[in-house]
Swiss-Prot record:
Organism listed in the record: Archaeoglobus fulgidus (strain ATCC 49558 / DSM 4304 / JCM 9628 / NBRC 100126 / VC-16)
Location(s), subcellular: Cytoplasm
Function: Catalyzes the methyl esterification of L-isoaspartyl residues in peptides and proteins that result from spontaneous decomposition of normal L-aspartyl and L-asparaginyl residues. It plays a role in the repair and/or degradation of damaged proteins.
Source organism, top-level taxon: Archaea
Protein name: Protein-L-isoaspartate O-methyltransferase 1
Keywords of this entry: Cytoplasm, Methyltransferase, S-adenosyl-L-methionine, Transferase
UniProt-listed Enzyme Commission number(s): 2.1.1.77
Pfam families on file: PCMT
Gene Ontology MF, one: protein-L-isoaspartate (D-aspartate) O-methyltransferase activity
Length: 216
Protein backbone atom coordinates (compact mmCIF):
# COMPACT_ATOMS: atom_id res chain seq x y z
CA UNK A 1 0.00 0.00 0.00
CA UNK A 2 1.49 3.39 -0.99
CA UNK A 3 1.54 6.57 1.09
CA UNK A 4 -1.38 8.15 -0.80
CA UNK A 5 -3.61 5.17 -0.06
CA UNK A 6 -2.57 5.09 3.61
CA UNK A 7 -3.30 8.81 3.90
CA UNK A 8 -6.73 8.41 2.33
CA UNK A 9 -7.62 5.56 4.70
CA UNK A 10 -6.48 7.57 7.73
CA UNK A 11 -8.42 10.66 6.62
CA UNK A 12 -11.58 8.63 6.07
CA UNK A 13 -11.27 6.98 9.47
CA UNK A 14 -10.80 10.33 11.21
CA UNK A 15 -13.73 11.79 9.29
CA UNK A 16 -15.99 8.98 10.46
CA UNK A 17 -14.73 8.83 14.06
CA UNK A 18 -14.58 12.59 14.67
CA UNK A 19 -17.39 13.71 12.35
CA UNK A 20 -14.96 16.01 10.55
CA UNK A 21 -16.11 18.90 8.40
CA UNK A 22 -15.37 18.58 4.71
CA UNK A 23 -12.67 21.28 4.84
CA UNK A 24 -10.71 19.59 7.63
CA UNK A 25 -11.14 16.15 6.07
CA UNK A 26 -9.88 17.42 2.71
CA UNK A 27 -6.83 19.05 4.31
CA UNK A 28 -5.87 15.90 6.24
CA UNK A 29 -6.37 13.86 3.08
CA UNK A 30 -4.19 16.18 1.00
CA UNK A 31 -1.17 17.07 3.18
CA UNK A 32 1.57 14.39 2.87
CA UNK A 33 2.50 13.80 6.51
CA UNK A 34 5.23 11.35 5.48
CA UNK A 35 7.20 14.23 3.95
CA UNK A 36 7.25 16.07 7.29
CA UNK A 37 8.53 13.28 9.54
CA UNK A 38 12.14 12.03 9.76
CA UNK A 39 12.84 9.35 7.15
CA UNK A 40 13.19 6.56 9.71
CA UNK A 41 9.59 7.16 10.82
CA UNK A 42 8.00 7.45 7.38
CA UNK A 43 6.46 4.00 7.47
CA UNK A 44 4.54 5.17 10.56
CA UNK A 45 3.45 8.51 9.10
CA UNK A 46 -0.19 7.44 8.70
CA UNK A 47 -0.50 5.72 12.04
CA UNK A 48 -2.59 8.00 14.26
CA UNK A 49 0.12 8.71 16.81
CA UNK A 50 2.66 11.43 17.68
CA UNK A 51 6.17 10.85 16.31
CA UNK A 52 9.59 12.22 17.33
CA UNK A 53 10.95 14.95 15.04
CA UNK A 54 14.19 15.64 16.91
CA UNK A 55 15.30 18.25 19.46
CA UNK A 56 13.00 16.73 22.08
CA UNK A 57 9.89 17.62 20.07
CA UNK A 58 7.10 15.63 18.42
CA UNK A 59 4.67 15.92 15.54
CA UNK A 60 1.13 15.75 16.92
CA UNK A 61 -1.10 12.78 16.17
CA UNK A 62 -3.31 13.44 13.12
CA UNK A 63 -6.49 13.20 15.21
CA UNK A 64 -5.28 16.03 17.47
CA UNK A 65 -4.41 18.23 14.49
CA UNK A 66 -7.89 17.60 13.10
CA UNK A 67 -9.59 18.29 16.45
CA UNK A 68 -7.74 21.58 16.93
CA UNK A 69 -8.65 22.69 13.41
CA UNK A 70 -12.32 21.89 14.07
CA UNK A 71 -12.34 23.69 17.43
CA UNK A 72 -10.88 26.80 15.79
CA UNK A 73 -13.55 26.79 13.05
CA UNK A 74 -10.91 27.89 10.53
CA UNK A 75 -12.24 29.78 7.52
CA UNK A 76 -10.91 30.76 4.14
CA UNK A 77 -8.98 34.02 4.12
CA UNK A 78 -8.23 34.11 7.85
CA UNK A 79 -4.94 35.15 9.43
CA UNK A 80 -3.81 32.47 11.88
CA UNK A 81 -1.00 32.41 14.43
CA UNK A 82 0.57 29.06 15.26
CA UNK A 83 2.83 28.71 18.30
CA UNK A 84 5.23 25.80 17.84
CA UNK A 85 5.98 25.10 14.18
CA UNK A 86 7.75 21.81 14.72
CA UNK A 87 8.25 20.19 11.33
CA UNK A 88 5.52 22.30 9.67
CA UNK A 89 2.80 19.66 9.25
CA UNK A 90 0.11 21.34 11.35
CA UNK A 91 0.82 24.67 9.63
CA UNK A 92 0.38 22.99 6.23
CA UNK A 93 -3.01 21.56 7.24
CA UNK A 94 -4.08 25.00 8.48
CA UNK A 95 -2.80 26.63 5.29
CA UNK A 96 -4.90 24.27 3.19
CA UNK A 97 -8.03 25.34 5.07
CA UNK A 98 -7.47 29.12 5.08
CA UNK A 99 -6.40 28.98 1.44
CA UNK A 100 -4.23 31.28 -0.64
CA UNK A 101 -6.09 34.37 0.56
CA UNK A 102 -5.31 33.39 4.15
CA UNK A 103 -2.03 33.49 6.05
CA UNK A 104 -0.41 31.28 8.67
CA UNK A 105 2.24 32.90 10.86
CA UNK A 106 4.14 30.26 12.83
CA UNK A 107 6.63 30.87 15.65
CA UNK A 108 9.24 28.23 16.53
CA UNK A 109 11.79 28.61 19.35
CA UNK A 110 14.26 26.02 17.98
CA UNK A 111 16.13 27.46 14.95
CA UNK A 112 17.01 24.04 13.52
CA UNK A 113 13.36 22.95 13.53
CA UNK A 114 12.30 26.25 11.98
CA UNK A 115 14.70 25.61 9.09
CA UNK A 116 13.39 22.07 8.62
CA UNK A 117 9.82 23.39 8.59
CA UNK A 118 10.70 26.11 6.08
CA UNK A 119 12.25 23.53 3.74
CA UNK A 120 9.28 21.17 4.08
CA UNK A 121 6.72 23.90 3.45
CA UNK A 122 8.66 25.45 0.57
CA UNK A 123 9.14 22.08 -1.14
CA UNK A 124 5.37 21.60 -1.15
CA UNK A 125 4.61 25.13 -2.36
CA UNK A 126 3.05 26.63 0.76
CA UNK A 127 3.60 30.33 0.10
CA UNK A 128 0.95 31.37 2.64
CA UNK A 129 3.00 30.23 5.66
CA UNK A 130 5.58 32.46 7.35
CA UNK A 131 7.92 30.79 9.88
CA UNK A 132 9.50 33.00 12.56
CA UNK A 133 12.20 31.99 15.06
CA UNK A 134 11.39 33.35 18.50
CA UNK A 135 9.63 33.05 21.84
CA UNK A 136 6.22 31.69 20.98
CA UNK A 137 4.76 32.72 24.33
CA UNK A 138 5.13 36.32 23.11
CA UNK A 139 3.23 35.64 19.90
CA UNK A 140 4.27 37.75 16.92
CA UNK A 141 3.03 41.31 17.27
CA UNK A 142 4.28 42.71 13.91
CA UNK A 143 1.63 40.71 11.99
CA UNK A 144 -1.15 40.92 14.59
CA UNK A 145 -4.09 40.88 15.06
CA UNK A 146 -5.05 37.30 14.25
CA UNK A 147 -8.44 35.75 13.58
CA UNK A 148 -7.36 32.50 15.19
CA UNK A 149 -4.44 31.36 17.37
CA UNK A 150 -3.43 27.85 18.36
CA UNK A 151 -0.62 26.60 20.57
CA UNK A 152 1.03 23.20 20.13
CA UNK A 153 2.70 23.11 23.56
CA UNK A 154 1.15 23.22 27.01
CA UNK A 155 1.33 26.53 28.89
CA UNK A 156 1.01 27.36 32.62
CA UNK A 157 -1.81 29.77 31.70
CA UNK A 158 -2.99 31.75 28.69
CA UNK A 159 -0.05 34.00 27.71
CA UNK A 160 -1.14 37.64 27.92
CA UNK A 161 0.49 38.64 24.59
CA UNK A 162 -1.52 35.97 22.75
CA UNK A 163 -4.79 37.33 24.12
CA UNK A 164 -3.76 40.85 23.14
CA UNK A 165 -2.95 39.71 19.59
CA UNK A 166 -6.27 37.89 19.14
CA UNK A 167 -8.93 39.85 17.27
CA UNK A 168 -12.16 40.76 18.99
CA UNK A 169 -14.42 37.90 17.99
CA UNK A 170 -11.39 35.65 17.52
CA UNK A 171 -10.74 32.20 18.91
CA UNK A 172 -7.71 30.48 20.45
CA UNK A 173 -7.04 26.80 21.19
CA UNK A 174 -4.37 26.11 23.81
CA UNK A 175 -3.38 23.24 26.11
CA UNK A 176 -2.89 24.36 29.72
CA UNK A 177 -1.30 22.48 32.59
CA UNK A 178 1.83 20.58 33.54
CA UNK A 179 1.26 17.10 34.99
CA UNK A 180 -2.43 17.22 34.05
CA UNK A 181 -3.23 19.11 30.85
CA UNK A 182 -6.52 20.22 29.36
CA UNK A 183 -7.20 21.66 25.92
CA UNK A 184 -9.03 24.98 26.18
CA UNK A 185 -11.01 26.96 23.64
CA UNK A 186 -10.67 30.68 24.38
CA UNK A 187 -13.01 33.26 22.84
CA UNK A 188 -12.34 36.97 22.99
CA UNK A 189 -15.39 39.20 22.78
CA UNK A 190 -16.35 41.92 25.26
CA UNK A 191 -14.51 39.76 27.77
CA UNK A 192 -12.69 36.45 27.62
CA UNK A 193 -14.52 33.14 27.78
CA UNK A 194 -12.88 29.74 27.90
CA UNK A 195 -14.05 26.15 28.10
CA UNK A 196 -12.25 22.83 28.30
CA UNK A 197 -12.47 20.30 25.49
CA UNK A 198 -10.79 17.56 27.51
CA UNK A 199 -7.52 16.05 28.72
CA UNK A 200 -4.50 16.05 26.38
CA UNK A 201 -0.74 15.52 26.43
CA UNK A 202 1.64 18.05 24.83
CA UNK A 203 5.28 19.02 25.25
CA UNK A 204 5.75 22.06 27.55
CA UNK A 205 5.78 25.63 26.29
CA UNK A 206 9.03 27.44 27.07
CA UNK A 207 9.48 31.21 27.02
CA UNK A 208 8.65 34.31 29.05
CA UNK A 209 5.08 33.11 29.62
CA UNK A 210 5.96 29.40 29.52
CA UNK A 211 7.21 26.98 32.14
CA UNK A 212 10.72 28.43 31.98
CA UNK A 213 12.42 31.24 30.06
CA UNK A 214 14.31 30.52 26.87
CA UNK A 215 18.06 30.20 27.27
CA UNK A 216 19.98 33.24 26.14
Amino acid sequence: MDFDEKRRILAERLRDELNLSEKVYNAIKKVPRHLFVPERYRTMAYVDTPLPIGYGQTISAPHMVAIMCELLDLREGERVLEIGTGCGYHAAVTAEIVGKRGLVVSVERIPELAEIAKRNLSALGYENVVVIVGDGSLGYEPMAPYDKIYVTASAPDIPKPLLEQLKIGGKMVIPIGETTQFLYVVERDNGVRKWSWGAVRFVPLYGKYGFRPLEE
